[in-house]
Amino acid sequence: MNRLQVELPGLSLKNPIIPASGCFGFGREYAQFYDLSVLGSIMIKATTEQPRYGNPTPRVAETPGGMLNAIGLQNPGLEKVMNSELPWLEQFDLPIIANVAGSQAEDYVAVAKEISKAPNVHALELNISCPNVKTGGIAFGTNPEIAADLTKRVKEVSEVPVYVKLSPNVANIVEIAKAIANAGADGLTMINTLLGMRLDLKTAKPILANRTGGLSGPAIKPVAIRMVHEVSQAVNIPIIGMGGIETAEDVIEFFYAGASAVAVGTANFIDPFVCPTIIEELPALLDELGFDHISECQGRSWKQTCHSR
């Protein structure tokens, strides 16, 4: 028995560990360190219809317990992803999750329709929540009606299941999650980065050229855990949890909150072996905690609470 195997809509994962979109590129750099086939899946870098060159520099700033980034969805565009990046990834035993972005609904639909045809793309992740793009993105992720409409439109053209990535920069994430689930989403991924800023001590000006950026890393983990805990009790679709994961213990905590798989982001920049290390350490941790299979951990925090009542 594979104690780590997870079955999700469109995704048969040998383990629940997935590098997060934007922190792993298309895997080429990390393939120099280890066989990517050990991973559960890969969330590839966000793809837009046309190439994007991203925001001006500086784009990254360190913070205590994390980092700020304002990359601006830099990517080679749909045509190159379809003709170069995805074919290259076919050498690995991996179901690919393609992250789709755009400035208007028509952009998402156009990319989703084409990229979902790729043989190794098993699911889409709609990036409706990126906080560092001047147009699009953030508007979709903060309005329940707009988010639901976009989900429906993409579902109509996609040949694979659709997961929607939620923004934490909202007043009521449960309301948005419910709207997206009711619109037919197959799953949710959460959370994206928190909007933040750093100021230069000498100039008193923002360090990032974009002024604001997305905060990621261990600093946001408690926020992510709380939001996964709330949303998982409100919807009946699976959640891929993310936000500050660095260890096998972090993975179990997300499962306890209600996640069915996890994505590892910023930690890949610090340690390129972080994902295979977590995969190797999970079985021993399951033994220590008394679980036969990782699925036994899913939702344990609130399921225990409900049972005790």
Swiss-Prot record:
Q: Which GO terms describe its cellular component?
A: cytoplasm
Q: What class of enzyme is it?
A: oxidoreductase
Q: Give the UniProt keywords, A-Z.
A: Cytoplasm, Flavoprotein, FMN, NAD, Oxidoreductase, Pyrimidine biosynthesis
Q: Which InterPro entries match?
A: Aldolase_TIM, DHO_dehydrogenase, DHOD_1B, Dihydroorotate_DH_1, Dihydroorotate_DH_1_2, Dihydroorotate_DH_cat, Dihydroorotate_DH_CS, Dihydroorotate_DH_I
Its pathway is: Pyrimidine metabolism; UMP biosynthesis via de novo pathway; orotate from (S)-dihydroorotate (NAD(+) route): step 1/1
Q: What does the record's cofactor remark say about binding?
A: Binds 1 FMN per subunit.
Catalytic activity reads: (S)-dihydroorotate + NAD(+) = orotate + NADH + H(+)
Predominant subcellular localization, coarse grouping: cytoplasm
* Positions with a binding annotation for substrate: 45, 69-73, 127, 192-193
Q: Binding residues for FMN, per the UniProt record? A: 21, 45-46, 99, 127, 165, 191, 217, 243-244, 265-266
Q: Which Pfam families match?
A: DHO_dh
Which terms does the UniProt entry file under GO BP? 'de novo' pyrimidine nucleobase biosynthetic process; 'de novo' UMP biosynthetic process
Q: What is its EC number?
A: 1.3.1.14
Q: How does it assemble?
A: Heterotetramer of 2 PyrK and 2 PyrD type B subunits.
Described function: Catalyzes the conversion of dihydroorotate to orotate with NAD(+) as electron acceptor.
**Protein name per its UniProtKB record:** Dihydroorotate dehydrogenase B (NAD(+)), catalytic subunit
Organism lineage: Bacteria, Bacillati, Bacillota, Bacilli, Bacillales
